[in-house]
Regions:
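Conserved donor sugar-nucleotide recognition element shared by glycan-biosynthetic enzymes
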Residues: 150, 158, 190, 253, ...
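Short, solvent-exposed loop/turn segments at secondary-structure boundaries
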Residues: 90-91, 185-190
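Residues that form or flank phosphate/diphosphate-binding pockets in enzymes
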Residues: 44, 71, 188, 251, ...
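N-terminal Rossmann-like NAD(P)+-binding domain of SDR-like oxidoreductases, especially those catalyzing
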Residues: 1-181, 223, 296, 308, ...
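Hydrophobic alpha-helix immediately C-terminal to the catalytic Tyr-X-X-X-Lys motif of short-chain
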Residues: 157, 161-165, 197, 256, ...
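C-terminal substrate-binding subdomain of Rossmann-fold SDR/epimerase-dehydratase oxidoreductases
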Residues: 3-4, 24, 105, 180, ...
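A glycine/serine/threonine-rich, flexible loop-to-helix segment
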Residues: 132-133, 188-196
Length: 320
């Protein structure tokens, strides 16, 4: 189907050169939109969007979200912020500023141009939860002073700003809480468990497990996550969130490590290290609301998604 340039929605994606943002760029372009990718390349990577640079309906702007920017757009997906402990703890002050000032700047832009805006929040707003699985009405159990607080509290403050702009200024917002997401284009040195395990297995190195390995996470494949985000953005204005997006299938770190070893054919052994402070023991979303409102749930099983991710890292490590 051919799209006239005048029929295309102009969509801004902050953090668009990152893992999740680049997949969102792909999908929104395929859907016939004009996409503006904004990134400062702190964790985003140009190689994630190289295949899009010749597309006449794709634009890249190098910009730091802590500074305002003036554009004419119809929709804004606000993804920009380091999302792994290795990256967000490297410069915790900058992490908090990116979440808070970035939200202020993007909400100000949305208010000015009357754009619809989606905040990519996080399951980290639940902290180390005492409620399991986590529902959107749960307020969380979060340390305000721990080493993860720069990310957790920054995202919580961003949510507050979104709802205040919605109530006070009638900005058309959406808020999604994203649980652990994985897939091709994950940063190889971001310290996330799936990328760590895969790279260690492919290199035949010990697979490092922090703690006893019985702590759990739920892992959602990136294509499923992108679908959920777009459905939320395009949904009716009578529901603005927050909305959990994630895979309700729970997996322990020991189970994940064994599955990665099996799929890679690796002979890696397990190595246990002390658990980091404030590391949640369990994390699993209740996605009843996403099912009810948007008929959304993940369709990619863990083995299938891991295999695609392993294939990506094999190619990356081989230099091809």
């Amino acid at each position: 189907m051919a799209f006239s340039p005048y029929d295309r929605e102009r969509i801004l994606i902050t953090g668009g050169a990152g893992f999740l943002g680049s997949h969102l760029c792909d999908r929104l372009l395929a859907d016939g939109n004009y996409v503006i990718c904004l990134d400062n390349y702190f964790t985003g990577q140009r190689r994630n969007i190289l295949h899009l640079l010749e597309n006449n309906y794709f634009e890249v702007i190098r910009h730091d979200l802590v500074n305002p920017i003036f554009l004419e757009v119809d929709q804004i997906y606000n993804l920009a912020c380091p999302a792994s402990p290795v990256h967000y703890q490297y410069n915790p002050v900058k992490t908090t500023k990116t979440s808070v000032m970035g939200a202020i700047n993007m909400l100000g832009l949305a208010k000015r141009v009357k754009a619809k805006i989606l905040q990519a929040s996080t399951s980290e707003v639940y902290g180390d939860p005492t409620v399991h699985p986590q529902v959107e009405s749960y307020w969380g159990n979060v340390s305000t002073t721990g080493p993860r607080a720069c990310y957790d509290e920054g995202k919580r403050c961003a949510e507050t700003l979104f709802f205040d702009y919605y109530r006070q200024n009638k900005v058309n917002i959406r808020v999604v809480r994203i649980f652990n997401t994985y897939g091709p284009r994950m940063h190889p040195s971001d310290g996330r468990v799936i990328s760590n395990f895969i790279i260690q297995a492919l290199r035949g190195k010990p697979i490092t497990i922090f703690g006893d390995g019985r702590q759990t996470r739920s892992f959602c494949y990136v294509d499923d996550m992108v679908t959920g985000m777009i459905r939320m953005m395009d949904g009716q204005d009578d529901f603005v969130g927050p909305l959990n997006l994630g895979n309700p299938e729970e997996c322990s770190m020991l189970e994940l490590a064994q599955q990665v070893i099996t799929l890679t054919g690796s002979e890696s052994q397990l190595e246990f290290l002390p658990a980091p402070p404030d590391d949640p023991r369990r994390r699993r979303p209740d996605i009843s609301l996403a099912k009810e409102r948007f008929h959304w749930e993940p369709t990619t099983n863990l083995a299938e998604g891991l295999q695609r991710t392993i294939d990506y890292f094999k190619e990356l490590l081989s230099g091809t």
